[in-house]
Amino acid sequence: MSIHPVVLVGGGPGAWDLITVRGMRALQEAEVIVADHLGPTAQLDKLCDVDAKELIDVSKIPYRAQVAQERINEILIEHAQAGRRVVRLKGGDPYVFGRGFEELTALTAAGLPVEVIPGVTSAVAVPALAGTPVTHRGVVHAFTVVSGHLPPGHPKSLVDWAALAQSGATLSVIMGVKNAAAIAAALIDASLSPPHPRTHHSRRLPRWRASIPVRVG
């Protein structure tokens, strides 16, 4: 029995046609697709013959349905060890807050080969499609991607908001809608001088509804 690499595919920022060509080919070759709502699953039929695949839903809906990461790892291992061609379809890029490295670690510990196909992260794609560059010559020469799922001051947060406020870089905050007010306050408290331009993109593509230019302060 042949063992095939488990392929971790970055599905891009939401729209089905923003996945990479290599990612699409991996889906077409797969026998099993392990996907959650963060990838382009709603229009998966535009990328491959869904009826010819086993599609396993491992929902990751914030504050609602969740499949534990440990169980996702087990599913990937079980099907790969059975000799099936397995794709793990993820949103954005597998390694940008996608827990892709956790899956790679579990798979390699089980003695299984892994291939990673990068994806376009929403941290750059969504601002770009809304007309907001994350860098601009003579204005900003750096950008930082930050998780906002924990508020500033949370004991488990690893983000130094004070340092970011002083960095001069564009901040692209992912999963930050719930804590947007607290994040803005923390940046101001750390001397990010208001008014400071900020654009709020409330959803990933194609489901985001509006881009709202606002100011911190």
Question: Where do the language-model regions lie?
Answer:
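Short hydrophobic/aromatic-enriched beta-strand-loop microsegments
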Residues: 52-59, 113-115, 134-144, 191-201
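Class I S-adenosyl-L-methionine
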Residues: 1-16, 21-120
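Short, charged, surface-exposed secondary-structure boundary motifs
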Residues: 45, 64-70, 125-127, 146, ...
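A contiguous loop/helix-start segment that scaffolds small-molecule binding in enzyme catalytic cores
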Residues: 3-8, 82-86, 140-142, 147-217
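A generic local secondary-structure boundary/capping motif
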Residues: 22-24, 77, 131-135, 159-163, ...
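Short acidic, glycine/serine/threonine-rich loops at helix termini
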Residues: 20-21, 46, 99-101, 127-129, ...
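Class I SAM-dependent methyltransferase SAM-binding "motif I" and its flanking Rossmann-like core
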Residues: 4, 91-167, 216
